[in-house]
Amino acid sequence: MKKLLLLLVAFPLLISAQQNTVCFTVDPNQNSTTAFSGFTKYVDVLGCFSIYAESTITDAKVLHAAAVAAELLDNNEDGIVDDPLIEVQLISESALMPIFFQDGNAAMNTFANNYNGNGVSAILYNGEIDPTQTGHWGDDATVEEVIHTINHVGHTNVYPAAFSMQANSSLMSSAMDVARGGQFMSVPNNYPASAWYHYDDQTCDYECMMIEYMYWAIVSYMGILNDPQTAQGISDEWE
């Protein structure tokens, strides 16, 4: 478990409540493939993570997503991705975060119907981004969705002994089974009283539960959840 904890906390600890300085620029989208035709804005984050956004997304929100990704990948802010193995993996899969104005619009449908890669694990919508409340539950989903992408595209592949998403395959799967009060391949009708992770989305399979568990573990360590309002709001899923 000590090795698992070290791997988990090695990359995401310095995000502040508000991004004060952003050292990126929003460039025009140069990706001409059909899947990306709905995006006009692009940011390259440290050469290994891309942000694509529609024209209706403000530059401030696009830059916020880029800053969050940079903080997670380069915690000491020296301009170099902290984990070179994660960097290589993200590059190999062309990891990215697409930002859509709303669910089901033309840009989203075009992307969903034409994207054929392994670099996407989550998406963001305009209404989920608040640069003034970084990662705050119910206000800004940027930290959550970027963490999901880095974990899913990066960590689960680079460190399978720690983070493989199959049951009985990794330190993380064993830890999650304890947190859920047992091993459940689908969502149980009721979680045991001993469980402190009890996500009840019936559409979320075991691997999905793993990705969510990794997020909760990381942001708990980061301290993002350390206020009474947040603790109360998430108690149905995480204690």
Spans of model-derived segments:
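Surface-exposed intrinsically disordered loops and tails
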Residues: 183-196, 228-239
